[in-house]
């Protein structure tokens, strides 16, 4: 697994995947030390039935903060978000959390597409196009986050 500094978006998606895995297969919680530790954290944080680990939430907050900075400082980034905005608004409207952030919506989109692919379900060309745009935004954010972290 890549670490948070290497690719923060992949890190968040990985944590979400491990949370779902541990919920689906609780008997495998001790299969590796990493799974055991994540399961213990989920237990302590009271999210065995739903929700996300503080690790994931904190990483998401960092990504959202960077997103806010870039909206004010980077015209190309702002343009990419504006192109993606109608799709994000539609996605948010279809969820039980219509007020989620744009970055959480991008991550949720990619996570849901991953789940559909695991189920061997077809992805529409429109969804694939939005996936490409969301991936580009998250890639840029992750690279900028990485550059900021390694410059310290």
Q: What would you call each of these model-derived segments?
A:
Residues 1-52:
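N-terminal interaction modules that seed assembly of large macromolecular complexes
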């Amino acid at each position: 697994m890549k670490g948070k500094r290497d690719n923060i978006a992949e890190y968040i998606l990985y944590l979400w995947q491990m949370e779902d895995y541990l919920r689906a297969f609780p008997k495998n919680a001790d299969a590796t030390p990493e799974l055991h530790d994540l399961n213990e954290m989920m237990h302590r944080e009271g999210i065995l039935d739903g929700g996300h680990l503080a690790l994931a939430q904190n990483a998401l907050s960092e990504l959202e903060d960077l997103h806010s900075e870039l909206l004010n400082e980077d015209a190309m980034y702002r343009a990419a978000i504006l192109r993606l905005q109608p799709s994000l608004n539609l996605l948010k409207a279809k969820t039980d959390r219509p007020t989620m952030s744009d970055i959480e919506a991008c991550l949720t989109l990619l996570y849901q597409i991953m789940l559909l692919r695991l189920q061997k379900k077809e992805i529409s060309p429109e969804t694939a196009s939005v996936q490409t745009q969301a991936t580009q935004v998250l890639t840029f954010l992750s690279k900028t986050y990485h550059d900021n972290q390694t410059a310290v």
